[in-house]
Design a protein with these regions (language model features):
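A short alpha/beta connector and helix-capping loop motif
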Residues: 149-171, 181, 185-194, 380, ...
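Long, well-ordered, tryptophan-enriched scaffold segments
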Residues: 173-319
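Glycine-/acidic-rich phosphate or pyrophosphate-binding loops and their flanking alpha/beta elements
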Residues: 260-263, 293, 314-329, 345-351, ...
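A glycine-rich helix N-cap at a beta->alpha junction
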Residues: 84-100, 161-178, 196-199, 358, ...
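N-terminal amphipathic, basic-rich helices that act as targeting or association modules
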Residues: 1-81, 238-262, 267-278
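Short acidic, glycine/serine/threonine-rich loops at helix termini
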Residues: 76-82, 123, 147-156, 178-183, ...
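Short, acidic loop-beta-alpha module within alpha/beta folds
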Residues: 116-127, 347-348, 365, 369-372, ...
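Cofactor-binding active-site loop characterized by glycine-rich and histidine/acidic residues
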Residues: 41-162, 332-333, 337-338, 346-347
Length: 513
């Protein structure tokens, strides 16, 4: 096997094109087999095999700094940087992290798994590299929906303004968890649909740049003409309007083509985007056939049949059911998600009430302030978000919702410890943050039935409310154990014989179990 000969990035540079093609197939098989045993992110990594191999053949990590946005597409990076043998412990206690991890390897620089941050990291690191006069490049890999986040645009704007030497590899698979929602993604989709025109343009650009002495000058002279042509033949490439050079799109599964583009980008004196088109879930039929999320993430599964069709479970399932029931009775209720309609349990609501469902992309801050605007206009918005991602929009929840005493409901899924999702996904801050928001009422259901009651009560309140519930299964209880959400209920009573007892144990939420 070629894979057994790859113990570090340098080994990739010794391989022939034919060996690289074999290696890509072997890596896909390895990832499917590993994730089938432990669970993990599948579709994103199957789509990032060739671009990762090209990256490590062109750039010399860790001398060159390779940054991964979100990080769930970095399994191939881990495999080729010496961690292949640790994959049986993927996402296990004390084992291999599901995201880049600084403690694991010198090849990992950032380890958060929240999206749209990498361009800001890249700007800062490129500033430090330039000041030190170091002969190293900074490469930022972003995509899989992350370009819908506002922070990515802030980083892009500052890169263009500063002129820092950063190579941005845009992995465009058209999706995050679900098909990406943004005008940018629509523009990129139109580019994807005209590969003939785009490939001709890309080859012409590279030929001009290779002309001795006059290549860069000729390119500069053609930019005005290209801009005019774009207005007619393709959507404006807004990257260049921000001062960031753009090249592509290229076939992200053609290692040689991606390598060639990256080598030219590495020589460019400024920020540059290399746009590659990839297929999420490539090479594994169950992932390719999964129209909803291309097996973005998967539990333990049988390789022959693939994971069972995903459906919300436990508290998330109870929330999904409650939202549809509430939506039937209250036409003013709207649901908002930040690129996670399936994981937050809103697919059924989306199907039943498409005009009252809003997927804003990876944009939690916008989601919360948009909900504030809806509430001002008389609607009753529900923002469904993981607890860990709610922290990204605390300022908006505090000022735009709380200060205005607006009736916005936050459905905070994955509250508490989330196990194999890792430290960046633990929902341990939402309770402390919600307590600081003016007028906030916090609900914590202890059963599936109580979640439904609390959602209805939260929507009846005149100010902000949060319903927080954990990952995993929910208790199923009878009506005798379901009270009103803001009333304590005595579930058990045990006093000494003949005595009243002077100790009361108060449990909230899942602690009731």
């Amino acid at each position: 096997m070629v894979l057994e000969r790859v113990n570090g990035p340098a080994d990739l540079r010794t391989l022939s094109p034919d060996e690289l093609a074999v290696l890509a197939t072997e890596i896909r098989d390895f990832i499917v087999q590993a994730v089938a045993v432990t669970g993990g992110h599948l579709g994103s990594n199957l789509g990032a095999v060739e671009l990762t191999l090209a990256l490590h053949r062109v750039f010399e990590s860790p001398r060159d700094i390779i940054l991964w946005d979100t990080g769930h597409q970095a399994y191939v990076h881990k495999i080729v940087t010496g961690r292949r043998d640790a994959f049986p412990t993927l996402r296990q206690a004390g084992g291999l992290s599901g995201y880049p991890n600084r403690a694991e390897s010198e090849h990992d620089w950032v380890e958060n798994s929240h999206a749209s941050t990498v361009l800001s990291y890249a700007h800062g690191l490129a500033t430090a590299v330039e000041e030190a006069g170091a002969a190293r490049r900074v490469v930022a890999v972003i995509g899989d929906g992350s370009m819908t986040g506002g922070m990515a645009f802030e980083g892009l704007n500052n890169l263009g303004h500063s002129g820092r030497r950063v190579v941005i590899l845009l992995n465009d698979n058209g999706r995050s968890y679900a098909p990406t929602a943004s005008r940018l993604s629509q523009s990129l989709a139109r580019l994807r649909s005209r590969p003939g025109w785009v490939n001709l343009q890309g080859r012409l650009e590279q030929l001009m740049l290779e002309m001795p002495g006059v290549g860069e000058l000729a390119w500069s002279g053609l930019r005005g003409a290209k801009a005019a042509i774009r207005e007619v033949f393709e959507p404006p490439v807004f990257f260049e309007d921000l001062g960031v050079r753009y090249t592509g799109p290229f076939d992200g599964h053609d290692i040689g083509r991606v390598e060639e583009a990256l080598r030219h980008a590495a020589a460019y004196d400024g920020p540059i985007v290399v746009h590659v088109l990839t297929q999420k879930g490539r090479g594994y039929p169950p992932a390719e056939d999964d129209d909803e999320k291309c097996l973005h993430d998967a539990p333990v599964f049988d390789i022959g049949t693939g994971p069972p069709k995903w459906a919300p479970a436990g508290y998330t399932e109870a929330f999904a059911r409650a939202m549809v029931e509430i939506g039937e009775r209250h036409p003013q209720v709207h649901a908002i998600t930040a690129a996670m309609p399936g994981p937050t349990g809103l697919l059924a609501f989306q199907e039943r009430f498409p005009d009252r469902f809003h997927d804003v992309g990876i944009a939690e801050q916008h989601a919360v302030t948009a909900a504030a605007g809806m509430a001002m206009g008389g609607l009753r918005p529900v923002v469904a978000v993981y607890s860990t991602f709610f922290t990204r929009a605390f300022d908006q929840a505090n000022l735009d919702v709380g200060l205005h005493e607006l009736p916005v409901v936050f459905a905070l899924d994955r509250a508490g410890i989330t196990g194999d999702d890792g430290p960046s996904h633990h929902g341990v801050l939402d309770l402390a943050l919600c307590l600081q928001i003016p007028g906030m009422t916090i609900f914590a259901p202890s059963s599936a039935q109580e979640l439904g009651v609390m959602m209805r009560e939260a929507l009846e309140r005149d100010g902000p409310a949060a319903v927080r519930y954990p990952k995993g299964m929910a208790r199923q209880v009878g009506p005798e154990e379901v009270g009103r959400g803001l009333e304590a209920k005595c579930l058990r009573h045990a006093a000494p014989s003949g005595g009243a007892g002077d100790i009361a144990i108060l449990a909230v939420g899942p602690l009731v179990q």
